[in-house]
Amino acid sequence: MAKLSVNDLNDFLSPGAVCIKPAQVKKQESKNDIRIDGDAYYEVTKDTGETSELGIASISLNDCLACSGCITSAETVLVNLQSYQEVLKHLESRKSQEILYVSLSPQVRANLAAYYGLSLQEIQAVLEMVFIGKLGFHAILDTNASREIVLQQCAQEFCNSWLQSRAHKNQNQVTNSVVNEHPLIPHSTSQISGVHSNTSSNSGINENAVLPILSSSCPGWICYVEKTHSNLIPNLSRVRSPQQACGRILKDWAVQQFSMQRNDVWHLSLMPCFDKKLEASRDEFSENGVRDVDSVLTPKELVEMFKFLRIDPIELTKNPIPFQQSTDAIPFWYPRITYEEQIGSSSGGYMGYVLSYAAKMLFGIDDVGPYVSMNNKNGDLTEYTLRHPETNEQLISMATCYGFRNIQNLVRRVHGNSSVRKGRVLLKKRVRSNAQNPTEEPSRYDYVEVMACPGGCINGGGQLPFPSVERIVSARDWMQQVEKLYYEPGTRSVDQSAVSYMLEQWVKDPTLTPKFLHTSYRAVQTDNDNPLLLANKW
């Protein structure tokens, strides 16, 4: 059983003692009896005496997503379904024709390197020796390339939504000097290269043009929205996370390349967050009942697995295990391992990428540096405003928002859940502000990068803490040490042209892009009408 504690989950909510969504069964006289024989249970029909053995009830991570009790604490109950023991068990019983992949996030690589005092290249070699040389995987890849594909999709989605929102305002004859008169703002999507003018052919993209767009790569945040703030679902980005994009790429390619069944390709993902297990279990991320990502492990679980297998990563750097990676099992157009120069936040750089892309595509600004003002509200909430190079008018406003304290404020800000009196006060302030500068909308965001963990993905719940018990290091200082490795200088090998080439090789028909790269969300209804269920808590 993987080691988890309440302290690992800053948003932990104690699960209820009973299911909060019980089946509604009308009381009626039973026509069957139940007979117990040893460890087996049988149902006996009273009229005919016919006997049938009852199966064992089970619950999966996917069932957990349909429950509206807790938010992200569910993995403390069900995480063993994707534990390292289950991974090892699968490897022991795997089919001979099976292809095994490992995908690795750059946050995990940086965390493991910092924990063991190794370089990124050294920890990468250790992981390859363990998974390929010892456990028999065919290939290990990082998610940098799939992340670049996702970022490009997110940026195009934002530009489409921004243009649709602007068109909607114009149809309603809403006067705005920046939108209607600004010479840099295009009057149609056809003026923008790389932005789709017809979103109906890109059904996965946020077609309703609801701003702000809220990033969706954090499954803890997605669970929170689906279970407690479903009114925000239209704002969520429809683009898959890098984990799920990578899983889809690998399985699609292997099935086609080797003419094999989808369930003969097995994919393990190494991620900084336990919630990624829940994401991998969503029905939306499976094809014909086969998941794109079969299992997810975090650095905390990897360390436990190393101990179980009696593997010392530091010793491996001195006495390496020979191994041979199967190059035939990797798409030739997908960069296997890239020590990229990481740009933007240590949570994937969504906001920074979208801001730069939108500045160029929407306003013709190549270098946003001189025209972006930053307002650091606190360590985990930072606002960015792009202004016109000549007039200093506000063009777009974005933010990074980490941790549930800031998320709750964001929710109130986006859909105004405050009291009427407070709303009136804010309205008066906004009216006065607009009277002084009619082009400013300080309370409006156009795009927000949202992560449930304080500090973002680099500080995910599955990341390893500072290793020494002899010296006390604050969580913030440790996170900065890991970030230093994450941002270690590298070479940008995945650019826009490389992303376009990968998409062409993977998705032959551009109209199918939404099927491969986009997803959907659903409101999870709560049952708060039963006072007995509400009172019966641990």
From Swiss-Prot:
The function of this protein is: Component of the cytosolic Fe/S protein assembly machinery. Required for maturation of extramitochondrial Fe/S proteins. May play a role in the transfer of pre-assembled Fe/S clusters to target apoproteins.
Any one of the GO BP annotations: iron-sulfur cluster assembly
- Places the protein is found: Cytoplasm; Nucleus
- The protein here is known as Cytosolic Fe-S cluster assembly factor NAR1 homolog
Q: Name one GO cellular component term.
A: cytosol
Keyword set, alphabetical order: 4Fe-4S, Cytoplasm, Iron, Iron-sulfur, Metal-binding, Nucleus
Family according to the record = Belongs to the NARF family.
- Binding sites annotated in the UniProt record for [4Fe-4S] cluster 2: 218, 273, 453, 457
Predominant subcellular localization, coarse grouping = cytoplasm
PANTHER family noted in UniProt? NITRATE, FORMATE, IRON DEHYDROGENASE
What residue stretch is flagged as signal peptide?
A: none
Tell me the superkingdom of the source.
Eukaryota
* A Pfam family hit: Fe_hyd_lg_C
Residues at which [4Fe-4S] cluster 1 binds: 19, 64, 67, 70
Source species of the chain = Schizosaccharomyces pombe (strain 972 / ATCC 24843) (Fission yeast)
| GO MF term set | 4 iron, 4 sulfur cluster binding; ferredoxin hydrogenase activity; iron-sulfur cluster binding; metal ion binding
